[in-house]
A protein has these predicted regions:
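Flexible helix-coil transition and linker loops at the boundaries of alpha-helical arrays
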Residues: 35-38, 68-82, 118-124, 136-140, ...
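Alpha-helical adaptor scaffolds
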Residues: 165-209
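Terminal, low-structured helical/coil segments at or just beyond the last alpha-helical repeat
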Residues: 237-283
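Surface-exposed, polar/charged faces of alpha-helical domains
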Residues: 77, 102, 109, 116, ...
């Protein structure tokens, strides 16, 4: 089992997350033992290469020119190793988040069941609730930071896979999308909104991810944050208009994807954007 499932209320979420991870092949990006698919010439060359490597075996060799050595990053073996490491870190990150959710639910339950004979005044209850929320917030932020570290490592491992053909495989794109999405949510919750923008932009470039309205919702929010920061710091107008434009583009796209162009929600957003005087959209 990848995730702790101590509380029934979170069991469904935990199982859904586990199922999502289990679909990622079992940690292999591409089969390595594919001799059956090789031509006779390729088999012959492979045998000759193995013989040459055996003759020239020198574990202490350190190449001065790294270019030739870097070619191993294009191999299936290297790609599979990096894919497994990325998957392992992704699983650890998700597991960290799920365990924290279980802990929060258990903590709230235990606090609610405690007898409060010493609480005689309403303000005492308010003060206690505030303390409890501070504890929950602190634990949530710690878990999200720990998870973010795992997700960042997963991204780094996937970035190491240089073979363009392997990067186009559905297994690679699936894991990359899952890691990006989890990284974005954790980073956003840690109040690092500007940092989510480049990863969000990369996310919507993968296959049909652009059709997911939450990605545009997050982008609109992040660009809105940047716009407001420019206002507060009295930054350059060109940057202000740039962020405002991008905010409106993604706000409109998120509304279109969720509600449809014929919906009252979409028409309302069009009016809001037109009042923003950045882009004009025909209703």
């Amino acid at each position: 089992m990848l995730f702790a499932q101590t509380q029934p209320a979170n069991a469904q979420d935990s199982q859904a997350a586990k199922d999502q991870v289990d679909e990622l092949l079992k940690g292999e990006l591409v089969p390595e033992n594919d001799d059956a698919e090789l031509t006779e010439d390729q088999k012959k060359r492979k045998k000759e290469i193995m013989e040459q490597e055996s003759l020239w075996k020198n574990p202490d060799f350190k190449g001065y020119n790294k270019t030739f050595q870097e070619l191993h990053q294009l191999s299936k073996t290297f790609a599979n190793n990096q894919f497994r490491l990325a998957l392992s870190n992704y699983q650890s990150g998700v597991n960290t988040i799920m365990k924290n959710r279980d802990w929060v639910e258990q903590y709230r339950k235990e606090e609610a069941e405690k007898k409060r004979l010493d609480e005689k005044w309403y303000w005492q209850k308010v003060d206690r609730k505030a303390r409890e929320e501070r504890v929950v917030y602190r634990e949530k932020m710690k878990a999200k930071q720990d998870a973010l570290n795992y997700f960042s490592k997963a991204i780094n491992h996937l970035d190491e896979i240089k073979n363009p053909d392997l990067r186009e495989r559905p297994e690679f794109k699936r894991l990359l999308s899952d890691v990006y999405r989890s990284w974005i949510m954790a980073e956003y919750d840690l109040q690092n909104l500007p940092q989510t923008i480049p990863i969000l932009e990369l996310y919507i470039e993968i296959d049909d991810n652009e059709k997911e309205y939450p990605a545009h919702k997050y982008l609109a929010s992040a660009y809105s944050f940047e716009e407001n920061m420019i206002k507060k710091t009295k930054g350059p107008d060109d940057m202000l208009f740039k962020y405002r434009y991008k905010k409106n583009v993604h706000l409109l796209r998120a509304t279109e994807l969720k509600y449809g162009k014929d919906s009252p929600e979409y028409k309302h957003i069009v009016n809001v954007i037109n009042r923003d005087e950045v882009i004009s959209v025909a209703q």
